[in-house]
């Protein structure tokens, strides 16, 4: 077999690379490397003329290996693979050398050093390219069903979009009702629409949709499999009420003598020991709180449908689906961590979500904002922004995006209820980023007279007798220290990843970002996809966002998983672990390292050997790195390919020194 003929193509990327690297000098160096038949430069290799240049060179010089020195392969590798395929050679005979992010961007101002590094990187790429192999593809069937985990507005929207396309959808939520956080809100900014008025129709549509099956009060326990064939195990918690016969009439709750704090109202109101979380709950089914139930039997006595089941047990469900969407939402920041604000200590320090429940007409105070200490309407309220956001001390350096608008909305609603009330907002920056949001901000100032103080309060003091509060803050615009007497202080608590997000991410096999939210495959080009084919993410589970962005991303996630389900098949490139059975010693180190449970063992010729599941394997290479005998290799990244690349880099360094 003749030696491979390599072509090297260096991209200027406008001035991104050529501004820091002498691309022409790099081309000249590459043309002298062993095995290189042609080297060329072009301002934008990813553009049609650049692609044409590569195709023409393949045909003219009979090239069978291509090295592209350009930007990150995450963006343009598929483009260049398509170029090779169009030219009649395997798309896997491409070696992509990232001389932008790995060189030009980190060595700006050092043209000589950056050029030298680019030469070394390309030399390594050429040696690896010579040893590249074709990669087979495997086709798997995709079950035309999807499980949507989380039934807030994101999960509901994804489920409806998929159901309307004819796909079977399992909409799963751990709570008693679907609706999520949006169900707790009073109104939505900037239009001040009633939140439940626009959410409830979607909740009902999801419940009545012929292609959507609601599974509420259930938790994910295990997920196995791969795109097209995910096996999901759930535990459906007992309601102690038969779902098929309960009519939701409420007679049981009326008879129940026990009242406990209502979690849905954040403890501001009460519920019975047999309850629905809120009046518009879907499904409208009652649940017995066994922790507080005194087993008096009154609920069973008054139930005309005889739906009470005191002996109900948890139920395990096993469901097979082709794809998964994760839309599990968020947790509100625990404001007790900001001890200087006295949340949980001072009665009249509350959070924005608690205000939402107060001003909700169906909430515990029937739409009236009150002081928890005495039930009176506050005459002066202070909102404090960025509580648990943009704060490295509590580990949340990010902006939660919606807190400013929450405060603006609630401040205006409070002024509508009582025009004589005073409302202050202490802020560092007001981030009115969305459509109509800046106008909403101006309305709060000009029409409602909300007062804005640029500064983060240092601390809050309480008068133990009146329960009134004093907020101490520096107005950084005026250069003054202010002490504001307030009846009520509202903390704009930030949005955090769900506490169980790590456990779910592990079951799904997907990554999380440094803030704990689920990590997308690419922040710009694949914002709803994950590293696991067939699993998409949507809503605040991916990162803080408002309702319009959440709905848009939910629709995007539905579209992403609908593609393989519509086709009914999915092609998987077999960049997967392979086993040399003659060398494998059956030590099981690789199985311990595999995060995807893709490695099992079989006995052959009297000893154990590793067996890899080509579909479950994701090609991470952890097993190959750990294998003490070298029996485990990663196709397309075999030892000889990686070592060849290292040798090429070292040899180039010697050449450049001579």
UniProtKB/Swiss-Prot annotation:
Descriptive protein name: H(2)/formate:CoB-CoM heterodisulfide,ferredoxin reductase subunit A
Annotated residues for binding of FAD: 150-173
Domain 4Fe-4S ferredoxin-type, chain residue ranges per copy: 236-267, 284-313, 575-604, 607-637
Keywords, alphabetical: 4Fe-4S, FAD, Flavoprotein, Iron, Iron-sulfur, Metal-binding, Methanogenesis, Oxidoreductase, Repeat, Selenocysteine
Reaction(s) catalysed by this chain's protein: coenzyme B + coenzyme M + 2 reduced [2Fe-2S]-[ferredoxin] + 2 H(+) = coenzyme M-coenzyme B heterodisulfide + 2 H2 + 2 oxidized [2Fe-2S]-[ferredoxin]; coenzyme B + coenzyme M + 2 reduced [2Fe-2S]-[ferredoxin] + 2 CO2 = coenzyme M-coenzyme B heterodisulfide + 2 formate + 2 oxidized [2Fe-2S]-[ferredoxin]
Pathway: Cofactor metabolism; coenzyme M-coenzyme B heterodisulfide reduction; coenzyme B and coenzyme M from coenzyme M-coenzyme B heterodisulfide: step 1/1
Protein species of origin: Methanococcus maripaludis (strain DSM 14266 / JCM 13030 / NBRC 101832 / S2 / LL)
Sequence positions that bind [4Fe-4S] cluster 1: 246, 249, 252, 303
